[in-house]
Regions:
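C-terminal and inter-domain tail/linker signature
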Residues: 1-172
Length: 172
């Protein structure tokens, strides 16, 4: 019996975390307080570093508003979800057209995509914490703020006496 209850709790926790992705995609910031715990906190490497600690649903609202200004057509696609205890892990892909300031770079009009991993802590049927790790290097490469891995390998292999080998072609 307790095993069934636990499975139901895990599925409920997954649904709560997935609801946050729906709120993001639907631009339903009015629903953030329904999904986020009053003591919500965000931490980790995010696409937008918060101005101070990200505490409370209002802080996440501000983060999403900045996100929508930079990438008005931003969408998140959930690629995987796993739950254990009060934790839910989401692997997702973000993407959209870079129209406003993002990572300090003005809009380029280019489409950008990157992956992120969220570890959500669920309490009282709401998201208490979002510990996120964003692939900031992928974003920086696409915005021209960092060289791509292929560019680095080509530069290293052109140095006389370098033992670095070029990366295989992406066309394989």
């Amino acid at each position: 019996m307790s095993r069934t209850i636990k499975a139901i709790d895990l599925e409920a926790n997954k649904a709560i975390a997935l609801r946050l992705a729906e709120v993001f995609n639907g631009r339903r910031l009015d629903l953030l307080e329904d999904v986020l715990h009053p003591e919500f906190r965000g931490r980790g490497i995010s696409a937008f570093p918060p101005e101070g600690p990200e505490v409370g649903p209002g802080a996440r609202r501000k983060l999403y508003e900045k996100f929508y200004q930079a990438i008005p057509d931003a969408r998140v696609e959930v690629l995987g979800v796993v739950a254990e205890g009060d934790k839910v892990v989401l692997v997702d892909r973000f993407g959209g057209t870079h129209r406003g300031e993002f990572f300090g770079r003005p809009g380029t009009g280019d489409r950008i995509e990157w992956m992120a991993i969220h570890i959500y802590t669920i309490r009282d049927s709401k998201v208490l914490e979002d510990a996120v790790m964003t692939d900031a290097l992928a974003i920086m490469e696409q915005l021209g703020l960092a060289p791509s891995a292929g560019t680095i390998a080509r530069r290293q292999s052109s140095i006389p006496g370098s033992k670095s080998k070029s990366l295989p072609s992406e066309s394989h």
